[in-house]
Amino acid sequence: MATIKEIKEFLVTVKELESPIFLELEKDNRSGVQKEISKRKRAIQAELDENLRLESMLSYEKELYKQGLTLIAGIDEVGRGPLAGPVVAAAVILSKNCKIKGLNDSKKIPKKKHLEIFQAVQDQALSIGIGIIDNQVIDQVNIYEATKLAMQEAISQLSPQPEHLLIDAMKLDLPISQTSIIKGDANSLSIAAASIVAKVTRDELLKEYDQQFPGYDFATNAGYGTAKHLEGLTKLGVTPIHRTSFEPVKSLVLGKKES
């Protein structure tokens, strides 16, 4: 009779819930065996559910595949709302029908999984472009225009160039056909891939800024206006990476000039 450990190792090879192997093993009345059967069935169901989720997030891409298009770039940005740091956009072309387990809107991915999924996108993407527009340009042209500049920069880095763009809630003045999708990072795998690339890239930049400008908690808050960040602004003042067109930074700068 096989040991429970041997059965556990064997069950990993079973891929279907209807497999006759389960029926056979269910005759074994050892509680440990029954526990391993239940565990493996849950794992198979989770894999099926994940595959269905990923399939549903390929609906926009599949419509474009039907039109004979394969070089489809997902575009997304991170960093519109922070008081400090750049806005970062990413453009990602995935291979046809590419499914990356766990890939989702970056806001829905557990932080501990960010780097793992970022690496999976890096490994499986046909091409990746990243656009970074700093706080000075944001202050000059406004955050909406800066976001478009970041996206255009990211797209310009792609090789090969895309045949179609899937963009998260934005239209770009480019001679490439495009689809603007509301909540695109939750509805398109290509945009979700761009979302995690932009997120990890920006988070890593803010960790570097945290070393340069301690006291604002940039490594944790990514430049957003948390209590620790606002406390740092009050105690230490404005840094070269702060957006002086954003409140309360703007008022602090004006107050300093007036005094």
UniProtKB/Swiss-Prot annotation:
GO cellular component: cytoplasm; ribonuclease H2 complex
Main location: cytoplasm
Pfam families tied to this protein: RNase_HII
Superkingdom in the source lineage: Bacteria
RNase H type-2 domain location: 70-258
Positions that bind a divalent metal cation: 76-77, 168
Catalytic reactions on record: Endonucleolytic cleavage to 5'-phosphomonoester
GO function terms (MF aspect): manganese ion binding; RNA binding; RNA-DNA hybrid ribonuclease activity
Keyword Metal-binding part of the UniProt annotation: yes
GO biological process: DNA replication, removal of RNA primer; mismatch repair
Cofactor binding description: Manganese or magnesium. Binds 1 divalent metal ion per monomer in the absence of substrate. May bind a second metal ion after substrate binding.
Keywords per UniProt: Cytoplasm, Endonuclease, Hydrolase, Manganese, Metal-binding, Nuclease
Swiss-Prot/TrEMBL cofactor(s): Mn(2+); Mg(2+)
Intracellular or extracellular location(s): Cytoplasm
Coiled coil: none
EC annotation from Swiss-Prot or TrEMBL: 3.1.26.4
Keyword Disulfide bond: no
Task performed by this protein: Endonuclease that specifically degrades the RNA of RNA-DNA hybrids.
Stored NCBIfam families: PRK00015.1-1 (NF000594), PRK00015.1-3 (NF000595)
Similarity section: Belongs to the RNase HII family.
Protein's name in the database: Ribonuclease HII
Organism: Streptococcus pneumoniae serotype 4 (strain ATCC BAA-334 / TIGR4)
Gene: rnhB
